[in-house]
Amino acid sequence: PIVLISFETGGVRLHEANAGLLAHAECMDMLQTLRGRVPVVAMIGSKIGCFGGMGFVAAATDIIVMSESGRLGLTGPEVIEQEMGRSEFDASDRALVFRTTGGKHKYIVGDCNYLIADSLTAFHQQAALIADLPWPQIEAMRRIGSEAKVRAQMALTKKISESEPSDARDVWAMAGNTAPQSLVDMDLETFLSNVKRLPVEEA
């Protein structure tokens, strides 16, 4: 058995924030209960993406599968622009939005385990492959669930923060990609063959 969750959400409405936070916590608690019993896979490939508190829920699953057009984050682009100003983040700049929240970026920084083609067939095939994985391999792909993982994530966050990146491409360069701009327009197969990812587990 395997649990597949297709995330397509911008988060809860602000006037339902408290109830939404409680629901998120309950979902994450249930995901921890399922840990080691049934693989739970987040699938993100819609036009809306996965934002708000549901970003936390997605992060609590065992594995995240994204297409290049999928987006994942906590605060959505429009809210960032509203709160910080367009000079800080222009939500109408699609290239910027996808460099920051899109599948390629999330794959490089380790938030996404598998980056696949933008088709239902690709998602079905990836789910079938995941269903056959041994538990130790699935457990190793989790983003949360142990003090060691927390320490690794915090170390990576500190490293990135100290570098003061002004764009996602600066983070890609930190991962060892010597020509980060070239990754933007690469087709999926070429991208996966050439990209270097941040070594979260070694951070």
Spans of features found by a protein language model:
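Conserved catalytic cores of soluble enzyme domains
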Residues: 11-139
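A structural preference for short, pocket-lining loop segments at secondary-structure junctions
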Residues: 1-13
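Amphipathic alpha-helical segments at domain termini/boundaries
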Residues: 82-203
